[in-house]
Structure formats: C-alpha cells, structure tokens
Amino acid sequence: MNEISKSFKFDFNHPVDQLWSIVADTPRWGEASGFPRYQSTEQLQTDGTIKVFGEVTIAGMNLSWEEPPANWIEGLWFEQLRLFNNGPFDSMATRAELVDKCPQSSLSIEISFVPRNLLGYFLARRLIAAFRGKVQQLLDIADQLIKAEQPDLFETDFQLSPSAKERVKKVKQAIDQTEYGHGLTDKLLEYITGKQEVDLWTMRPLALAHRWQVEPRFAIELFLQSVREGLLESRWDVLCPRCRVSKAKTDNIGELPGKVHCHACNIDFEANFARNVELSFSPSPSVRAVEYGYYCRSGPGFTPHIKGQCTLDPGESRALPARLSPGEYRIRTLEAGDELIFTHDANLLPEINLLQGQLKLGGNSPDGEILLHNNSPVQRTIVIEDRSWLSEVLTAERVTTMQAFRDLFSDQVLRPGDEITIRNISFVFTDLVDSTKLFADIGDAAAYQLVREHYAILGEVVRKHDGTIVKTRGDGIHAAFLTPDAALLASIEMQQAIRQFRNASRSDPISIRIGINSGSSISVNLNDRLDYYGKTVNFAARLESQGRAGDISMSRQFVEDPAVAEILRDYNLHEHEAVFKGSIEPVAVYQIAP
C-alpha cells in the first residue's frame, strides 16, 4: 500500500537545547507515554554491519521488526526507521528538525507509515491524528516546568508500598547514623521514587554528585553504604571499549570474566580496571522493583554521549549541518573498525574520511557543517562521540582505592591467582619515627594508645582525599590513591595533622616520615583482601626510609607529574641521590618538610 505521512510544526518558547532534550529523549518519552518495553537482539552480517531487531507483544499480538541505525546531529535533527516483519505495518519512520530562533525555537516533525493491510491503513491514520496532540501536550508541560524551574520533564510519582515505606524509614535511619550518609539520604530517596525506570537501570553516583553539587566522594560513599543497608544493589559492568555498552555483569569483583565478546562491535576485549570495569547501582527490589527492557534503542536519547551518527552508502558523501561544543571527541564506525580522537576548539569542524576501514581527518568543513565521506566498498555508520561522559563512570580502579570500599566491601576480592594491572596509582608509606624509644620512654600501654590515635588521624586524612589504607605495617600505614596530587596533598595534611596533634595534646614526641611513588602496579588477592604488588609499591616503601621526622620523600617520576609539580611550587624541594638495596646506580630522591 502507499505511504501515509503527515508533517507538523511546533513553536517552543525556550532555547533549542531544551527542545532537543525533550523530543530526542525517546526512551523516556516512550516510558512516560505508557509504551511497552521490548526485547532487542543483534545479528552480525557478512559485510561487517550489525542488524538490530526488536520484539514485543501488544494486545496478544507479537510484533517484530528491524531497527536500522538512527541518524542525528545533536540539537539539529534526527531520523528513525522501523521495518516490520509482521503486523499491520511494513514500516514506520519519523524525522525531526529543530531550528534555533534564539531565545525561542521551533520543531518540524514528519511521521510516516507504510500499511501492510487495511487495518494498518486505518491504524496509521488514527496514530497520525493523535500524534500532533501528544507532542503539543508534551511541549506545553515542558514549558510550564521550565517556567517553574523544574526541568525534569519525565519524572514520575512512584508510590512505595506500606512495607517498603517502613523498610526505607529504617534504612534511612541506619545510613544517617553512619559517617557515609553526608545528609544525602533524602536526595537519594527522592531520586529513587521520582525518576523513571530508564534512569534507575544504571545509577551513577558521580553523575548524581554533579546533579546535587556535592563532592564526588560523598555520593560514592552514600551509594556504598546504601548497598550495605539494602537500599541499593551494586554490580560490576564490563563495558565494551567501542560502544561503551555493558557486555558482562557480575555481583562480585572476583567473578569478572577475563575476556568478553561484544556482538554489536564484533570484538573480543579484556576487563580493565581503569578503562571499562564500572561499579554501577540500581534500587533494591524490596524498595522499588525495576524491569529492564527497551523503549527506544536506536535514538539519540539512548546514547546521549553520541553527538552525531550518520549512515553512508558505499561511495556516498554528505554535508550535514552540525554544531559541537568545544572538547574531545572520538570518531568511530558503528561497526567494528578504526577509530580516532580529535579536539574541537569551537572553530571549523574537520572533514571525516573513511577509506578501506581507516578513518582519517581531512581539511576543514564549511562553517556550520561537517563533511562525511564513505570511500569504502560497504555501507558504514559514522559515529561522533563526546568523551567527557567517561568522567561519570565509577571505575574499579577508582572505587577500590577508596577507604569506604575497603570498609564496606571487604568480601570483594579477586580470585586467588588472578592479577589485575592498574595503569597508574600512587602509593604512600608512613612510619612513626623512633617508635621503639617511644615505647621505652612512656610504657607499652601509653605508647600503644598513641599509635592507635595516630592511625585514626592518618585514616581520616586518607579518606578525605579519596584514598584507602591498604594495610598497616609496623607503626605506619600503606595507603593507595588514584591520582598523584591526591597522594601528595594527603601526605602534606598528614604531616600537618600529626604536628597539630603533638603540639595540642601532649609533650610526647611523635612524628612521622612519608614516602610516595606513582606508576603501574598489579592488584592481587592477598590474605583475602585487595593488595598491590610490583616495583612501584616496593620503591614507595623504600623511599619512606630515606626521610627524617616530618619529611616527605618522593621519586623523580612522582615529582614530574604536572599536578604534583604545581603543588610543590609552594615548598622548598631538596634533591639528593641514594643507592637502594638491590640496585647499583644511585637514584634521585626528592624531599619536602611541610
């Protein structure tokens, strides 16, 4: 039968960015409209492309379809297509174009159906007739919420059951009584009950820290404590390095698979603590059961970090209107293949060429456009991806170096014999100077109490700077930090805190010396806990012995870190050489006495 189509135009009294966040967010729109979730599968084709299929049952009728990749440029336009295998339609397509009329904007939408039979013909006309009213209603609600400074259009009012309310009340009290609640429990509960299921499938504490305008550590600790108390559940997701979709899940870090396959990208990859192993969260089913499925898989709302996506036939070139914010972007194909990274500085966008599976940047595209060329012999979909979203991913590398994780998830350890490489981590070793003399001077009981108090001081500083105490050793600690600057700032504060403790509370001589080093390491299971092994950690321990009371001793590699160098500008940095056990050549040691 012939295609039935209709175009509509809408005016919106707010900027185009806000309009885009509404009309392009098809997953949340689908859930808010009461559409059923559907299941999705992927099939690799002989030419390397991926076909995505959807399936759902509506009113007892099973529908299945192919869902080709959607095309879009953020803030400007998008188009989607479904090719049905059965049911009343052969196909359904939508195309939307947005126009910036600063400070207002406008939207043009074309919706079309190809009916398979008379039922499809009448159903298409009915759906098209209702479509305009639904879009206008959505925009009117959005207009009211924006005016009321309540921009979350797709919030829901989920009602807890009486038993869940009682459970949540007890859980909230338990969390608030710990040091990890930070007064944020109410905000978390509002999020769990006020957001759609789409928002709750994968909850990211770093994203909520930004939303709540609080320190990232506060949100992470809140989430970890909430898992402990039964408000949330946690899981380890292994993300595909290309499409960034979770391809393996496990509850315990010791059960992470060594190798993972992504059917969509047709690649095998390994779990990497720093790059693609994420600790994510969802509500406990005892509080709010969340059902998983898709409302719209192919649209821009499902992958908001993808700013542009376009399918090109062999030999096809397209000049697309485009605008990208300054920042770092990754260009890749939706299919397995090459990728490259470029930095956009708000000037002209580069020309993108695909030739024999290789992506290359050409000259500048015309102002306000981006030129895409597919010079390969097969159809390919080019993807432009904003890399800043990675900052919201709570990696295994980051969370396992936090004290709250050690305190609350001590059962999360690697399998015996497993090793995980950590690409960059900083280690701090401390030692209580002249502790033997201290015990002799003031007695075992008093000295032991002093040692415990000094451990508490150091532990508080370590946690404040997002570090973790790996273990205590002798009269000192072995701590780990994700970044070198955090390790240095914590070490400086440790020295200052111990000095204040000594001066304010007693005349007993107590002081520490510290050694710091950074680099790669191996995470292992040692005595049923996460520990670290390798040259980096060994050298940090040796550096500690080089200092005197009040000193911080550092390696050359550590002090050459740009963030560390900036901090050290405020201190007198001294350098000397030392020969360490097991080495012949002298090694540079750098020291400050803050």
Where are these regions (language model features)?
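A conserved amphipathic terminal alpha-helix motif
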Residues: 1, 112-157
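Hydrophobic ligand-binding cavity/cleft-lining segments
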Residues: 1-46
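Hydrophobic-ligand binding "helix-grip"
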Residues: 31, 57-106, 112-114
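Cys/His-rich short segments
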Residues: 227-295
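Regulatory cytosolic signal-relay segments
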Residues: 371-423
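Catalytic NTP-binding/metal-coordinating core of nucleotidyl cyclase/transferase enzymes
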Residues: 412, 416-490
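Catalytic core of nucleotidyl cyclases, primarily class III adenylyl/guanylyl cyclases
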Residues: 429-430, 461-489, 493, 500-536
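Cytosolic regulatory/linker segments at or just downstream of nucleotide-handling modules
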Residues: 549-594
